[in-house]
Curated annotation (Swiss-Prot):
This is Polyphosphoinositide phosphatase. It comes from Mus musculus (Mouse). It comes from the Eukaryota. The gene is Fig4. InterPro entries: Fig4-like, SAC_dom. The PI(3,5)P2 regulatory complex regulates both the synthesis and turnover of phosphatidylinositol 3,5-bisphosphate (PtdIns(3,5)P2). In vitro, hydrolyzes all three D5-phosphorylated polyphosphoinositide substrates in the order PtdIns(4,5)P2 > PtdIns(3,5)P2 > PtdIns(3,4,5)P3. Plays a role in the biogenesis of endosome carrier vesicles (ECV) / multivesicular bodies (MVB) transport intermediates from early endosomes. Dual specificity phosphatase component of the PI(3,5)P2 regulatory complex which regulates both the synthesis and turnover of phosphatidylinositol 3,5-bisphosphate (PtdIns(3,5)P2). Catalyzes the dephosphorylation of phosphatidylinositol 3,5-bisphosphate (PtdIns(3,5)P2) to form phosphatidylinositol 3-phosphate. Has serine-protein phosphatase activity acting on PIKfyve to stimulate its lipid kinase activity, its catalytically activity being required for maximal PI(3,5)P2 production. Residues 758-770 have a biased composition (Acidic residues). Residues 154-547 form the SAC domain. Residues 707-790 are annotated as: Disordered. The keyword Transmembrane does not apply. Keywords: Endosome, Hydrolase, Membrane, Neurodegeneration, Neuropathy. It is found in: Endosome membrane.
Amino acid sequence: MPTAAAPIISSVQKLVLYETRARYFLVGSNHAETKYRVLKIDRTEPKDLVVIDDRHVYTQQEVRELLGRLDLGNRTKMSQKGSSGLFRAVSAFGVVGFVRFLEGYYIVLITKRRKMADIGGHAIYKIEDTSMIYIPNDSVRISHPDEARYLRIFQNVDLSSNFYFSYSYDLSHSLQYNLTVLRMPLEMLKSETSKACQESFDIFEDEGLITQGGSGVFGISSEPYMKYVWNGELLDIIKNTVHRDWLLYIIHGFCGQSKLLIYGRPVYVTLIARRSSRFAGTRFLKRGANCEGDVANEVETEQILCDASVMSFTAGSYSSYVQVRGSVPLFWSQDISTMMPKPPITLDQADPFAHVAALHFDQMLQRFGSPIIILNLVKEREKRKHERILSEELVAAVTYLNQFLPPEHTIVYIPWDMAKYTKSKLCNVLDRLNVIAESVVKKTGFFVNRPDSYCSILRPDEKWNELGGHVIPTGRLQTGILRTNCVDCLDRTNTAQFMVGKCALAYQLYSLGLIDKPNLQFDTDAVRLFEELYEDHGDTLSLQYGGSQLVHRVKTYRKIAPWTQHSKDIMQTLSRYYSNAFSDADRQDSINLFLGVFHPTEGKPHLWELPTDFYLHHKNTMSLLPPRRSYTYWWTPEVVKHLPLPYDEVICAANLKKLMVKKFHRWEEEIDIHNEFFRPYELSSFDDTFCLAMTSSARDFMPKTVGIDPSPFTVRKPDETGKSVLGNKNTREEAVLQRKTAASAPPPPSEEAVSSSSEDDSGTDREDEGSISQRSTPVKMTDTGDSAKATENVVQPMKEVYGVSLSSSLSEEDHSIYARFVQLGQSQHKQDRGNQQLCSRCSDGVIKLTPISAFSQDNIYEVQPPRVDRKSTEIFQAHIQASQGIMQPLGKEDTAMYREYIRNRYL
């Protein structure tokens, strides 16, 4: 019986599209090119898609013979001696899908990729370029005048911008789900109810697998979570026709990975953001929720920590923490018909029974378990009601829904006016967020795949004992989720998520035995590395939804941002305003067409003729009303029954049906992650190795001066980091010039002036405006007359740079040591020392090294055998003869020694 499980690696990783006049032949192979599959695509159908998959696994020789026959069979009589009948159209790395507008189908292929992360040996790639190929032949093509316009709209979705995929790791699910799924078949076989389960369904591809016995490994592949899959509509037409290895699901969002080097021990910190494909769109055009409970700008962010010393999922140490952002789950919008920086918020529909919020939170209970914690960052005190409208409605909805949930699983609501606290000089925003983060992580816990370390049991930490979640024999599970929102879910939300992630990261490091206390300080290499990841994450998500990068960053809320940052904030605000006003409508049309929300149909209005897309996203407006859920029992009974555990991770018939389990031998390529990661069949170089090229705390953040503590958890001064000191040329000179310029520069603009149209400020709320304008810049000003002090800052003493200080005159002992050092160096390089005689007083006792061996200059092509003396040769020959039974006669000394041994032992 198999005792282990592993994810199945797709056998279609390299593709070549061959073309004839009647068909396309798509040949796919694994990376080692030992197994091949072939798809046949008919080109004679003008509007229908005909794809044939024979599901046969070819060898390389069989594929060559097949292509050779196709080449000969498609040659015409005129070209028997000349051109080929089979043309190689394009090489690719995966199929994004098939799409049709008003003419025939197109095939979308990934032609360039770049590795972005590595999780347990499973590579995550970013799409760099794609190719869109029209399938029908020109002889059967039926042209339509609007086809080219639809094609331009579809291609406006830039697939080379933050789309990710993996051949072996399910990016649509969390690490906790993926590792839980690997245990499901093994636990099912061990359970007493396995027989009853087998009678009701069969998840195993091999018949009689359970009764066969023997050793092996379960290969497991699960269904993706379609909410975070962006090409599901493009693959839907072939999903039931072709082998599942052809289906490559992609996600949209962000993926970044950095290496935390802890005294030489590599620890990978990975950040993955999954953007929902439901109710997706741009900032002002997608607000609130639709009728199915899907909210705008919904992003699931997961931080993964793994010890890179061990690659395997079963033997390695892995930890993750998940949190979510999303628009307030109500029917609300903002009118953008008038040119206003902050359009008024309006409630489109009354929802007294919180029906749409109930659907949304029921989905979250099923995926994440309980408790659901809402961190609401919108304003609560305004002279003119703007953001406060959302707070009041959200409080009412949560209060209503909590009446019908069990008390231990109620929704936790945390309101906090972050913009108000930012304006106050007496309140530290991040300190308050840190308190909230501690309480949140203690309630939800986090995932780790190993039990508590022995030192944690002997010397338990007080905070560790209060940690929530679900404890299992093999580790911990995260139960529940933090849902953070403001108005746009961009700037404030990203800072709040960073603080919660920083708190969770401390617990993750503590669980892996890397720190002695679950606490991380600012201005350490580890936190700087993590902050940079989160800022890249926030910039990417902000560009996707708002059209610009973040306006307010972590440094802004720490109030340590340089004065030059304010001008950048103004530019980002203007960029966001321009994008929202002029380009959001076109981007929304592209998203609707790409995701299949709108299907072009002959005789019906075109996409650009629709006055609004409201009816596309709210399907109940164009059909009969479906049966509504109960207003009191708004949750799914099966979901609540298994709380606080997420229902999607519970071993039950519904979840096991989503798995495909197949038995493999231990070293088969479909489950051999070692072979997939190291690829011993190809030549590689260190320059191209991903793990050496990724961002590292030691190379990019740790100071390069001598005597610095190499620990990434040591608090450093702002000017000691590797980024600020060695990241740019002449940084210290630039810092001096910046301080001189700042002395004569005007004070930084207030936060109201910086982002009048950003999400963090309201044009009518100016209660604490004075506190902002009085904020002083954190950069220390240097007067123009202090040139001597500026020079001292540039030229540091040797003691501070190298950790040693040389006096004006050396002692006699030091002088002798230095003379010996020079003598050794000269002897090493065999220099002429005729004119470099040292005085006898200094050269006494100098070590003279004389080589006693001379080695030949061997190379990879030729090695000269060393010379062996006669005695050694005789000993070796006697050893060989002894193994053949030919013993040498004993000498007198050996005989005397043996007699002495017998006398002492037996007599």
